């Protein structure tokens, strides 16, 4: 990561921008105090690349052993009170057998630093050859239910609301005890988009940021009950979401028409994310330069 990142975040926050940092976590793990600098500058959330729980997965996907670095990055972010979202790339035959263990790591992390909002997202890498065993939403949901031993069930999940429902899935849970989750109301079709810009920014910031509000024993009053419940909802919510990106083998124009994750291109305007990253069979981008 660039050395002036804290300064960039600080300047952006002065203009009311919200920052979510996508990172492999190496610098966050190795440089003590760096997470704190980013937090002080105004960073809201770290989206941490987290492909599995063994070094073998990282050696295959990233070219080096990284599990200890991931653990250290999570620890440093938690100590700096930065919200954390775990973001794995799920590849068939590489780490699809570790989906449950990744979720378990997220839940265990909440137990150690329970005010951290943890999320889980799944992305499918693009292949130059037609994949024989592609990751699909039904397959991912089956893996989640099987590998969590029913802690999270297929029927818990809803499709996307703003985007095409075949593009993503999500569910939110409230932690109850060490290994019990209560499914929260499904919110398919609901979100922060159809409102003012200020309200949308506040929604995103509240959704992903670390919460520091707690009640000490004996501090509660009867009038605090609702506030305490709302704080618990924020502090102990565990969200699981996934997005299956399209490639040359399954590109669907109807899905692209509803895409709201776009790249701004000087030649092509607003290009849907999947189309922007689309390549031909020789690996040459069609829109991205």
Label the model's feature ranges:
Residues 2-120, 124:
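Radical SAM/AdoMet-radical enzyme domain recognition
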Residues 89, 275-276:
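Surface loops and adjacent helix of pleckstrin homology
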Residues 79-234:
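Radical SAM enzyme [4Fe-4S]-AdoMet core and its adjacent flexible, acidic
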Residues 26, 94-96, 149-152, 239-243, ...:
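A short linear-motif detector with a strong N-terminal bias
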Residues 204-267, 275:
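Basic, glycine-rich polyanion-binding accessory segments appended to enzymes
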Residues 278-289:
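A short, polar/charged loop-to-alpha-helix boundary motif
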């Amino acid at each position: 990561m660039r050395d002036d990142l804290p300064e960039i975040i600080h300047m952006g926050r002065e203009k009311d921008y919200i920052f979510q940092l996508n990172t492999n976590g190496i610098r966050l793990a190795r440089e003590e105090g760096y997470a704190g600098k980013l937090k002080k500058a105004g960073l809201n959330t770290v989206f941490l690349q987290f492909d599995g729980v063994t070094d073998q997965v990282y050696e295959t996907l990233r070219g080096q052993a990284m599990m200890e670095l991931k653990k250290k990055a999570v620890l440093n972010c938690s100590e700096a009170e930065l919200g954390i979202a775990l973001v794995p790339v799920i590849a068939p035959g590489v780490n699809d057998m570790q989906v449950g263990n990744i979720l378990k790591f997220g839940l265990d992390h909440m137990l150690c630093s329970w005010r951290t909002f943890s999320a889980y997202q799944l992305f499918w890498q693009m292949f130059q050859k037609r994949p024989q065993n592609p990751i699909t939403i039904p397959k991912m949901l089956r893996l989640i239910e099987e590998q969590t031993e029913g802690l999270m069930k297929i029927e818990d999940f809803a499709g996307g609301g703003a985007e095409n429902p075949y593009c993503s899935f999500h569910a939110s849970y409230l932690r109850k005890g060490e290994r019990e989750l209560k499914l929260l109301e499904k919110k398919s079709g609901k979100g922060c988009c159809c409102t003012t810009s200020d309200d949308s920014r506040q929604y995103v910031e509240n959704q992903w940021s670390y919460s520091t509000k707690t009640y000490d024993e004996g501090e509660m009053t009867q009038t605090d009950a609702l506030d305490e419940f709302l704080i618990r909802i924020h502090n102990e919510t565990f969200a699981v979401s996934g997005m299956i990106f399209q490639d040359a083998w399954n590109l669907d124009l109807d899905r692209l028409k509803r895409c709201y994750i776009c790249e701004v291109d000087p030649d092509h305007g607003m290009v849907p994310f999947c189309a922007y990253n689309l390549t031909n069979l020789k690996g040459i981008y069609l829109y991205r330069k």
